[in-house]
Amino acid sequence: MQNLQEKASEWSGVETNHAFAIDDTNLFQKLGLQTFINLSTNFYNRVYVDDEEWFRSIFAKSDKDKAIQNQYEFLVQRMGGPPLYSQRRGHPALIARHRPFPVTHEAAERWLLHMQQALDNISDIDHDSKIMLMNFFRHTAYFLVAGVEQKNQSLHPCKDADGRHPCKNF
Ligand code: HEM
């Protein structure tokens, strides 16, 4: 059986070592706090007015300012900066935190489209850093799709380990 990283690579088209090239450099030092605040603000400004109601509605119960803060604090921490996210929220546990939401392939592509557009609009991120960030985002988005799918299946009371549905007829 494929593990989640392998599935994420296959579905995203981004090899794991490319996704984690972010760990070979300190993007927080290079770009600074304000850039990540600007990126997350730009991203969520797009998400909350998305023309696609099905996507916008995934965020309907979340406060926009909180969502921005959650994301930029996570990114600052993940990109080599201070652990702002964990100090406030604890372990990121991203799969578990995304479980309430329909994190499908389609949702991942929509999320990535907004993130690509947000990156394109931030002039103080250099080309190489944008590529590195996007590889990390693509891989992580599909890691979440695979992880949420696996968690939902393993807790499905009518599905056994082989994926059969023993109580399908009830
Ligand atoms: C694949 C498509 C994705 C969907 C549909 C999705 C959806 C959501 C939603 C609805 C929230 C709740 C908003 C909030 O209150 O913070 C959330 C939170 C969050 N997402 Fe995503 N997300 C996706 C991908 C990603 C990716 C790729 C990352 C990281 C690179 C990410 C990182 C986060 C973080 C850090 C939070 C805050 C969690 C918390 O503290 O509760 N998400 N996401």
Curated annotation (Swiss-Prot):
> Would you kindly state one Gene Ontology biological process term found in this protein's UniProt entry?
response to nitric oxide
**SUPFAM superfamilies reported for this sequence:** Globin-like
Per UniProt, what is one Pfam family of this protein?
Answer: Bac_globin
What drives induction of this protein's expression? Down-regulated by nitric oxide (NO), particularly during nodulation mediated by Sinorhizobium meliloti inoculation.
Q: Which residues form a coiled coil?
A: none
Amino-acid positions noted as binding heme b in the UniProt annotation, renumbered to this chain: H98
One GO MF annotation is: heme binding
Q: Which InterPro entries does the UniProt record give?
A: GlbO/GLB3-like, Globin-like_sf, Globin/Proto, Hemoglobin_trunc
- Lineage top rank: taxon: Eukaryota
Q: What are the protein's UniProt keywords?
A: Heme, Iron, Metal-binding, Nodulation, Oxygen transport, Transport
Q: Spell out the PANTHER family in the cross-references.
A: TWO-ON-TWO HEMOGLOBIN-3
Please give the family membership noted in the entry.
Belongs to the truncated hemoglobin family. Group II subfamily.
Please give the subunit comment from the record. Homodimer when ferric.
Q: What does this protein do?
A: Hemoglobin-like protein that exhibits an unusual concentration-independent binding of O(2) and CO. Required for general plant development and during nodulation. May promote shoot organogenesis from root explants.
User: Could you tell me what this protein is called?
Assistant: Group 2 truncated hemoglobin 3-1
The organism is Medicago truncatula
| Gene giving rise to this polypeptide | GLB3-1
